[in-house]
């Protein structure tokens, strides 16, 4: 095997299946695994200290309790999976360790196919993977001996695969990605080699496995009816065969109107062997799975609304994931975007890995004139006075991005500030997801509002957030990289967005009151500064009395939580300030005025 020449493989690390691709001769090529298949089950089995990955592990998925499936769902969490050693002892494995076994298997057979050592990869993740999940994916790659050059969103990778030959004209593209375990839908804008995600939505607890399970339930109900309530749920071998038969039936019904589910000698009872011969029509299958299909409808509407476009403005529909072969899925998508037929020119099982390989080619310089732009799924904010979530990077901002804003202290002579970072769409920090916090010390003592604290949010191309706080007077700074943002699922993100909309009116009232209180307290401090300043001796007595009265009125309104009165008194102060500006500075010359 020859030395590493900097080749970058593209990996679709899926919940149910994974795929690996590489650029060869300027075109992406999907690599077959040792069993001659172009996709590999994302399944790891531990048996007698042996680690089995892929199809071999899938064949013992039900019978071997040490078989781990859908590990992707645990990425970014502290959850562990337990497996039993040959000596009977138990060991715990992190999601990163299990995922690394899948990546290592993909890497090993890719090296054998290519004939070169491989150390670099682009790995795809669902659009809604958060910082913790993305970091966990990079860690898994590192454990597998891969330097993960870039983490990109699965729908974006798919659009890249479809769009490489179409980058010369602007298009609005809907990507409908129904995989084995997750569902994503995204709207992208593709123009002159630039791919920009306009909006994303989805459900990470919905996938082709759910369609399989409906068939399993159907067969199980038939068996129970025909065999006096026979329940096979604890018969591991029978359940393994049921699962395989259900998946096979689903695939066959994508191409034909009916199929025969044949399971001879499925199990044995006191009355003898149980044989299953059951016809399942496509119509019945679609009836059984209609509630699942309907769960994909709202996310399509959501991304169209979020992107602020009309369905007829969508130029192309891309279908991703093997489950999109189902005719009912295609019909639903077509009904949501009238007049547009989905583009199925690339194998939906392979398209994401192909896009990842193309991105690898971009990073190596082998593919020119393509720029990939992803977005952040939720607003990133810091908590400010009164618990308000002040946004720095708003939802659906294109990444990579860096945003800075100047803040100050909330108390006199404050020597440190806590920087609290949160994620979500609600105006109040407490209603959002806390991502992390850190402290900036060494601030030079000064009246509140005087120190200049610069907060910078930097979100890299992998969607990983770095937060920095810097005192512009002392130049002292501190920072953190957010590696755990609460492990938000797609469902949680969509719920947060819905909650923000549902509570918008109440939240706005709360926020307005806090802002009024903060403004009122700031005015009281400003008036005190004015009265204590050398210029105060130049003020007529009646002006000083007005200021003292304003201070008392504002202070009383704050203490009484009388926000209507507070609003009036703040306006009175602003009018007084305007009058003073005209009276003492009619020609623009500097004179005594409030700050």
Curated annotation (Swiss-Prot):
It comes from the Bacteria. The keyword Nucleotide-binding applies. Keywords: ATP-binding, Chaperone, Nucleotide-binding, Phosphoprotein, Stress response. InterPro entries: ATPase_NBD (IPR043129), Chaperone_DnaK (IPR012725), Heat_shock_70_CS (IPR018181), HSP70_peptide-bd_sf (IPR029047), Hsp_70_fam (IPR013126). Induction: By stress conditions e.g. heat shock. CDD domains: ASKHA_NBD_HSP70_DnaK-like. The modification Phosphothreonine is found at residue 182. The keyword Phosphoprotein applies. GO terms for biological process: chaperone cofactor-dependent protein refolding; protein refolding. One of its GO terms (molecular function) is unfolded protein binding. It holds the Pfam family HSP70. Acts as a chaperone. PANTHER family: HEAT SHOCK PROTEIN 70KDA. Belongs to the heat shock protein 70 family. HAMAP family: DnaK (MF_00332). This is Chaperone protein DnaK. The gene is dnaK.
């Amino acid at each position: 095997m020859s030395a590493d020449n900097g080749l970058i493989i593209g990996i679709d690390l899926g919940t149910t299946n994974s795929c690996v691709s590489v650029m060869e001769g300027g075109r992406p090529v999907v690599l077959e695994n040792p069993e001659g298949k172009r996709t590999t089950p994302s399944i790891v089995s531990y048996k007698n200290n042996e680690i089995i990955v892929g199809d071999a592990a899938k064949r013992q998925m039900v019978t071997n309790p040490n078989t781990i499936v859908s590990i992707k769902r645990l990425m970014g969490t502290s959850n562990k999976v337990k497996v039993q050693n040959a000596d009977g002892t138990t060991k715990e494995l992190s999601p990163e360790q299990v995922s690394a076994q899948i990546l290592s298997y993909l890497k090993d057979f890719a090296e054998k196919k290519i004939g070169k050592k491989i150390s670099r990869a682009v790995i795809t993740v669902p659009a809604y993977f958060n910082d913790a999940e993305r970091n966990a994916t990079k860690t898994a790659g590192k454990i597998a001996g891969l330097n993960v050059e870039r983490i990109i969103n699965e729908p974006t990778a798919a659009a890249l695969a479809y769009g490489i030959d179409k980058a010369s004209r602007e298009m609005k593209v809907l990507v409908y990605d129904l995989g084995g375990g997750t569902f994503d839908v995204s709207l992208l804008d593709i123009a002159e080699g630039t791919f920009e995600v306009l909006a994303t939505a989805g459900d990470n607890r919905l996938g082709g496995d759910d369609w399989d399970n409906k068939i399993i339930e159907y067969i199980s109900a038939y068996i129970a009816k025909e065999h006096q309530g026979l329940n096979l749920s604890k018969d591991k071998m029978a359940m393994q065969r049921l699962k395989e038969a259900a998946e096979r039936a689903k695939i066959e019904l994508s191409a034909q109107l009916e199929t025969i589910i044949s399971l001879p000698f499925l199990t044995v009872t006191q009355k003898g062997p149980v044989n299953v011969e059951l016809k399942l029509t496509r119509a019945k299958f679609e009836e059984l799975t209609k509630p699942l299909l309907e769960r994909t409808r709202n996310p399509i509407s959501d991304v169209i609304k979020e992107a602020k476009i009309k369905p007829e403005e969508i130029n192309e529909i891309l279908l991703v994931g093997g489950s999109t072969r189902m005719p009912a899925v295609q019909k639903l998508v077509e009904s949501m975007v009238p007049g547009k037929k989905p583009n199925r020119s690339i194998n939906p099982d392979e398209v994401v890995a192909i896009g990842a390989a193309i991105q690898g080619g971009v990073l190596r310089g082998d593919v020119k004139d393509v720029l990939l732009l992803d977005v952040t799924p939720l607003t990133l904010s810091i908590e400010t006075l009164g618990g308000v979530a002040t946004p720095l990077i708003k939802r659906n901002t294109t990444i990579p991005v860096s945003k800075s804003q100047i803040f100050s202290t909330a108390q006199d002579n404050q020597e440190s500030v806590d920087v609290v970072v949160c994620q979500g769409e609600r105006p109040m920090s407490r209603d959002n997801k806390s991502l992390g916090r850190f402290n900036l010390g060494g601030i030079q003592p000064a009246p509140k509002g005087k120190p200049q604290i610069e907060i910078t949010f930097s979100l890299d191309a992998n969607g990983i957030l770095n937060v920095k706080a810097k005192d512009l007077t002392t130049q002292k700074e501190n920072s953190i990289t957010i590696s755990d943002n609460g492990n938000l699922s797609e469902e949680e993100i969509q719920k947060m967005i819905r909650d923000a909309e549902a509570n918008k009116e109440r939240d706005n009232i709360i926020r307005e009151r806090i802002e009024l209180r903060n403004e009122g307290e700031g005015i009281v401090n400003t008036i005190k500064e004015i009265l204590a300043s050398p210029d105060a001796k130049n003020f007529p007595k009646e002006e000083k009395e007005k200021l003292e009265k304003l201070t008392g009125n504002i202070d009383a309104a704050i203490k009484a939580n009388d926000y209507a009165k507070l609003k009036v008194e703040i306006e009175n102060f602003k009018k007084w300030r305007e009058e003073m500006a005209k009276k003492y500075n009619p020609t623009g010359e500097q004179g005594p005025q409030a700050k």
